[in-house]
Structure formats: structure tokens, C-alpha cells
Amino acid sequence: MSDYLLQMNGIVKTFDGVKALNGIDIKVRPGECVGLCGENGTGKSTLMKVLSAVYPYGTWDGEILWDGTPLKAQSISETEAAGIVIIHQELTLVPDLSVAENIFMGHELTLPGGRMNYPAMIHRAEVLMRELKVPDMNVALPVSQYGGGYQQLVEIAKALNKKARLLILDEPSSALTRSEIEVLLDIIRDLKAKGVACVYISHKLDEVAAVCDTISVIRDGKHIATTAMSDMDIPKIITQMVGREMSNLYPTEPHEIGEVIFEARNITCYDVDNPGRKRVDDISFALKRGEILGIAGLVGAGRTELVSALFGAYPGRYTGEVWLDGQPVDTRTPLKSIRAGLCMVPEDRKRQGIIPDLGVGQNITLAVLDTYSKMTRIDAEAELGSIDREISRMHLKTASPFLPITSLSGGNQQKAVLAKMLLTRPRVLILDEPTRGVDVGAKYEIYKLMGALAAEGVSIIMVSSELAEVLGVSDRVLVIGEGQLRGDFINHELTQEQVLAAALSHPDAPDNNARKTA
């Protein structure tokens, strides 16, 4: 019998004559966690679709061996029956069904006569959740009553209920808090100890390094290297992913910081569902020309609510004023904000940043479509010229501007959203989690773009949950905790520990004034 549970040998997958996968080899042992690394669009998802029979046997070339035996699955149900289970980035739970019903979906336990055996399903669900160190979960409640971290564990329980021997985790931590991520990584370690193998796909290379035994890197559809994690570090992984050495993940573009041009005064946001509760409590700050201002804080601190209110996109009631060039401006709707010179790239790219049914180019010019209007028609030639320039400037990878934007990788979709906002020629640009779900190469390009914009005099407000990112690109850092401003720091030798201490402190604590800007 083979030492390997899974062997994928020489996998080739072609779309319209173009090889999306070109001879990929992947091997996984029982109890081993393999990190599958590569930039967006390099073929990671395509490879996993081949493995799980989303692309059935016969639609690709190469060989898959499962426990040493050729696997020629024609459907997902066949691969799941073999013990191969994928947990996708977009969770597949049904919100209104109970935890137990979600765990057993498609594999329900029944009584004679066909009725559901709910007591047995609840008991088994409780056993599974105890194995995942969640003994107090009420599995009879709707899964919607639990947060993202718990829902991720329900997905894992669902996979284990299918007798998973190989668990494929695709960006499993994208919506989790730091503490929830640590729980997830501990559970993966426990599963490994029980002999369950894992393929871990994530742009968060610190997680990959923490939990994976082996790293397999693919680039442009080709297998670059498979290396023991003990012989690797994060810079080496990045070099293999992008094909060049990156001496500094956070490139710095020299830029002069000028006078104050933007002020947020006494911004208060009230909870949408509980109008008596403040999500943002009387926050004021100023922003200078060419300055990059990072906003840090724990999840739920009120960062997104604050910047949404500044842009006129907060769905609840809010108060306060926005000033530009020493004058109050009306930013009560996104359209008014854009006209005033204030633009925002939202946190939820898929729901708020793009229109899925439109092409790449149409999404890029959407905010300035009136610029190309001639009476009752659009000047298509002028519009296409702008689209081509933005695609070139953003290094946006697309075969055609007429392709659906959903055909692009996450990083290229984000570049398209950025291009759309930059066509409005903003003076103040708000970026809410600009690199979430974006690979390391695209992150680098976004950081370079931010520096170049600041050098041109554009002022930038960036919200990020990654403290290393905040400290890596910001000139100044605001720290928000429980809806209140907890610190305003010049980013000179500022540490993650200092930012976290401010986020967790009482607003009147004396340490909050350390490094505080004038």
C-alpha cells in the first residue's frame, strides 16, 4: 500500500485551448496538512475542483490515486463517499435550519416509514461538536444564531459526519476573528493527530506556516515546488509564489504630507436594529493632504460603521459633520460624497463593490458613466480608452474587458473596484479592508498604488483587521474600541502591542496619550 493517501499526478485542465493547470503534482499523507499556496488565478481552485469531481473524470488529463487506487469520480457525491470533503470559503449552511439539520443535510437519519430521527441526529451532532471542543452548543437552535467562527466549526462537523479522510479548507479564516482562527488551527492539529489529512488554502501565510507540514506552491497553473515547512519560511513561500524576491512586503513610496484638508466632526452612528445603542460614539479626527491614515481596532469596534457614515453609506441613523478645505460638505449619500471628492472601496466587494452581471469594463466606468454620455448614447470609444488605461495602470489580469467581472480572481476584482473609484479623481479615498481575500502579489501592488496616490496628494483612510498591514503602510494610526476613539498615533516605531493595548484600554486611560498626534 502507498504511503500517500492522495496522489495527483500530472494534472492538466484546459479551457478553450488555454491550460489552466499544466502538469500539477500534489501528494498528501494520512494525518498531514499540506498548504496549497499561489496567487489568485494560479489554479488552486481549479485543482480542487478536479479533485472533488466538480470537473469529473474525463474532462481533465492526468491521474488521481486514492489510497493507491485510481480515482475516476464522476460526481461530488462519489468523492465524498470516498472521504474527500471540501469546505468552501462561502459557507454552505442553511441559516434557518438547526445545527443538527445542517450537519446531516443530505445524510439524514430516518425511522421506519421515512420520518426523520431527530433525537439520533441531535445526539450525533452533540458528539461531533464535543469532538471539536464545543460542548455547550445547542445543536437544536438555528445555525444563524451562531457567529462565523461557530458556523465554520459546524461545516467541519458536517465534513466529519461524512467520514472525511481528507479535508480541503479553502480560505477557512477569511471571516474569523483572531481568537476564532486560533481555535480553528487547534482543531486542525487535533484532526491531524487522528489521521485526518488536510489541504489548507489561504492567503494568510502565518496560518499556513503555523499548521501545515508541507507547502506546495503553484504559479501560472504549474507546480513550482513542494517543500517541508521546516525548511521554509514566509519570505521563501512568497518568493516561490510570485517568482521574484520581495525584500519588503510593504513598499514605501516617498510622499509629502501637507496641510489638513479633511475633518470628521463628532460622528455618532446608532445601531440599525437597536437605535438606542451607539455603534460609533462622538469620534472626531483630521486628515492631511497626502497622508495615509490607518484605522485599527478589534472586530465590532465600529470602524466600518464610521467610514460608511463618512461616505453616506451607513444604513442606520448617524450624526456629525464632514469638512473639506475648511468648509462643511454634504456627504449624506454616496453620490454626494463622490461629487465632493470623497470615495470609498467597501469591505464587502461581492455585495457592494461590483455588479456581477456586468463586464469588467462596465464595472470600472460605472461611477463616471455620465462622462461618456453624448445626449442619449454613450461614447463607447472614449469609454473603452479609459477602461484600457485603468486595466494597464492597475496591472489587472483579464483576457478582455468584456468578460464578466465574476470571471476574475478576487485580487483582480478588487483592482477593478479601485479603478472605478479612481476614475472619479478623489481627493480623499476610503479603503475598507482593501486586501481581504487578496493574494500576496496583489497586496503588494495595492500598497504600491496607495503610496503613489499619496505622492500625488490623495489622502487615504484605510481600515484593516491586519495590524501588520496597518503599521506597514500608514503614516498615522487611529485606534477605535467599543465605538470610541482610543488613540491617535504617529506611526514611528509603533508596535502591534501598543495598538492592541490602546484598543483594549479604557478611553480615559493615561497611556492613550502616548505618541498621540498634536
Curated annotation (Swiss-Prot):
<keyword id="KW-0547">Nucleotide-binding</keyword>
<feature type="binding site">
    <location>
        <begin position="38"/>
        <end position="45"/>
    </location>
    <ligand>
        <name>ATP</name>
    </ligand>
</feature>
<comment type="subunit">
    <text>The complex is composed of two ATP-binding proteins (XylG), two transmembrane proteins (XylH) and a solute-binding protein (XylF).</text>
</comment>
<feature type="domain" description="ABC transporter 2">
    <location>
        <begin position="262"/>
        <end position="507"/>
    </location>
</feature>
<keyword id="KW-0813">Transport</keyword>
<dbReference type="InterPro" id="IPR027417">
    <property type="entry name" value="P-loop_NTPase"/>
</dbReference>
<keyword id="KW-0472">Membrane</keyword>
<comment type="similarity">
    <text>Belongs to the ABC transporter superfamily. Xylose importer (TC 3.A.1.2.4) family.</text>
</comment>
<dbReference type="GO" id="GO:0015614">
    <property type="term" value="F:ABC-type D-xylose transporter activity"/>
</dbReference>
<dbReference type="GO" id="GO:0016887">
    <property type="term" value="F:ATP hydrolysis activity"/>
</dbReference>
<keyword id="KW-1278">Translocase</keyword>
<keyword id="KW-0067">ATP-binding</keyword>
<keyword id="KW-0762">Sugar transport</keyword>
<dbReference type="GO" id="GO:0005524">
    <property type="term" value="F:ATP binding"/>
</dbReference>
<keyword id="KW-0677">Repeat</keyword>
<dbReference type="InterPro" id="IPR003593">
    <property type="entry name" value="AAA+_ATPase"/>
</dbReference>
<dbReference type="InterPro" id="IPR017871">
    <property type="entry name" value="ABC_transporter-like_CS"/>
</dbReference>
<keyword id="KW-0997">Cell inner membrane</keyword>
<dbReference type="GO" id="GO:0005886">
    <property type="term" value="C:plasma membrane"/>
</dbReference>
<dbReference type="Pfam" id="PF00005">
    <property type="entry name" value="ABC_tran"/>
</dbReference>
<comment type="function">
    <text>Part of the ABC transporter complex XylFGH involved in xylose import. Responsible for energy coupling to the transport system.</text>
</comment>
<dbReference type="InterPro" id="IPR013455">
    <property type="entry name" value="ABC_transptr_XylG"/>
</dbReference>
<keyword id="KW-1003">Cell membrane</keyword>
<protein>
    <recommendedName>
        <fullName>Xylose import ATP-binding protein XylG</fullName>
        <ecNumber>7.5.2.10</ecNumber>
    </recommendedName>
</protein>
<dbReference type="InterPro" id="IPR003439">
    <property type="entry name" value="ABC_transporter-like_ATP-bd"/>
</dbReference>
<feature type="domain" description="ABC transporter 1">
    <location>
        <begin position="6"/>
        <end position="245"/>
    </location>
</feature>
<dbReference type="InterPro" id="IPR050107">
    <property type="entry name" value="ABC_carbohydrate_import_ATPase"/>
</dbReference>
